[in-house]
From Swiss-Prot:
This is DNA integrity scanning protein DisA. The keyword Cell inner membrane does not apply. It comes from Frankia alni (strain DSM 45986 / CECT 9034 / ACN14a). Homooctamer. Its cofactor is Mg(2+). Participates in a DNA-damage check-point that is active prior to asymmetric division when DNA is damaged. DisA forms globular foci that rapidly scan along the chromosomes during sporulation, searching for lesions. When a lesion is present, DisA pauses at the lesion site. This triggers a cellular response that culminates in a temporary block in sporulation initiation. Also has diadenylate cyclase activity, catalyzing the condensation of 2 ATP molecules into cyclic di-AMP (c-di-AMP). c-di-AMP acts as a signaling molecule that couples DNA integrity with progression of sporulation. The rise in c-di-AMP level generated by DisA while scanning the chromosome, operates as a positive signal that advances sporulation; upon encountering a lesion, the DisA focus arrests at the damaged site and halts c-di-AMP synthesis. NCBIfam families: PRK13482.1 (NF010009). Keywords: ATP-binding, DNA damage, DNA repair, DNA-binding, Magnesium, Nucleotide-binding, Nucleotidyltransferase, Transferase.
Length: 359
């Protein structure tokens, strides 16, 4: 799920300065040359109003040009698409009343310009040998690929453990659904695990963006681990969203789950109320029945439209499991062949779920 607009700008900027891009190559050249730099990633009337001195260039961007221009005093201004160098050796004069927590002149200017213009600004420190990015109201130090990969691999190992636990609780839920023994606790535990896995994956996606071309293998591993998780998230909520709930639609509930604090996410009672369950302390032990979305999604070659019609017609998974071929054919869009496929598919799923739980 998408985060706030500031996060989108932040990630887009990280992608633009990721290893393997011409711009990152230019920054690395500046670092290796032991010089500093102040670079504004965008140009408009507001930026122009902060610029004094220097000279206009309007030439095509290249890493070598950026490196050579950084040798001069003053800031460099690039076009918003980073394809052209607009100005160089300019003196930036931001509003001194704009708050900043930085101490060095270059970094203070960078933070103020970023806040005042709402364009990303990069400050390359000659003394500390770091690249600091100021964007969307935050400061972020760009690390090398080795440091990012180390953090990403730790997060990936955590994701693998959480995914393994998710598969266990999801398998248990499937078996309980077949036996019609599901409680609110069982269903909410799966939603909780799905949200935890999604959050870890979202963090790893940030590393993938930051790594650029160095993040290809990490991206493939993430894709493999997260296959089907987002769909499972939606179907679990649709299966157990109480009828007439004030929580709203499944999409609204998923959005609220994404916005929950880490502390609230660990509390199953709070989680249950977000999904729409109401009641006292015994809310988690209340028995509930799924509609059947999760189970029907596992039947091969069954279109989503047909799944919706089957759920609308039968109402609960238990009625679906009890339905014969003739009963299934009564649903619009379900012919004899598809009815048999659904019947056999549900029977196999029921058998395998029970076996996995007890054998």
């Amino acid at each position: 799920m998408a985060g706030p607009p500031g996060d989108d700008i932040f990630r887009a900027t990280l992608a633009a300065v990721a290893p393997g891009t011409p711009f990152r190559d230019g920054l690395e050249r500046i670092l290796r040359g032991h010089t500093g730099a102040l670079i504004v990633l965008g140009h408009d009337k507001v930026v122009e109003g902060l610029c004094t001195g220097g000279f206009e260039l309007d030439v095509e961007f290249s890493a070598t040009r950026l490196r050579e221009l950084a040798k001069m005093d003053g800031a460099i201004v690039l076009s918003s698409d980073l394809q052209r160098i607009v100005r160089a050796a300019v003196h930036l004069v931001p509003d001194p009343t704009v708050p900043t927590e930085e101490s060095g002149t270059r970094h203070r200017t960078a933070e103020r310009v970023a806040k005042q213009t709402e364009y990303p600004v990069i400050s390359v420190s000659q003394s500390m040998h770091i690249i600091a990015l100021y964007v969307a109201g935050r400061r972020y130090v760009l690390d090398g690929s080795a440091a990012i990969l180390s953090r990403a691999n730790q997060a990936l190992a955590t994701l693998e453990r959480y995914k393994l636990r998710l598969d266990e609780v999801a398998g248990t839920l499937s078996a309980l659904e077949i036996e019609d023994l599901v409680t609110v606790r069982d269903a909410i535990s799966v939603s909780q695990r799905l949200e935890m896995v999604r959050r870890i994956a979202d963090e790893i996606e940030g590393y993938v963006v930051e790594l650029g071309t160095d993040g290809r293998l990490l991206s493939l591993q993430l894709e493999e681990l997260m296959a089907g998780v987002e769909t499972e998230r939606e179907l679990t909520v649709r299966d157990y969203l109480p009828a007439g709930s004030k929580a709203g639609s499944a999409a609204q509930v998923l959005s609220e789950l994404s916005a929950m604090s880490p502390t609230d996410l660990l509390d199953l009672t709070v989680l249950a109320r977000v999904i729409g369950f109401s009641g006292g302390a015994d809310i988690l032990d209340r028995q509930i029945s799924p509609r059947g979305y999760r189970m029907l999604a596992k039947v091969p070659r069954l279109p989503r439209m047909v799944v919706d019609r089957l759920v609308d017609h039968f109402g609960t998974l238990q009625k679906l499991l009890a339905a014969g071929v003739d009963d299934l054919q009564a649903v619009d869009g379900v012919g004899e062949t598809r009815a048999r496929a659904v019947r056999e598919g549900l029977s196999r799923l029921a058998e395998s779920s029970i076996l996995e739980r007890y054998v």
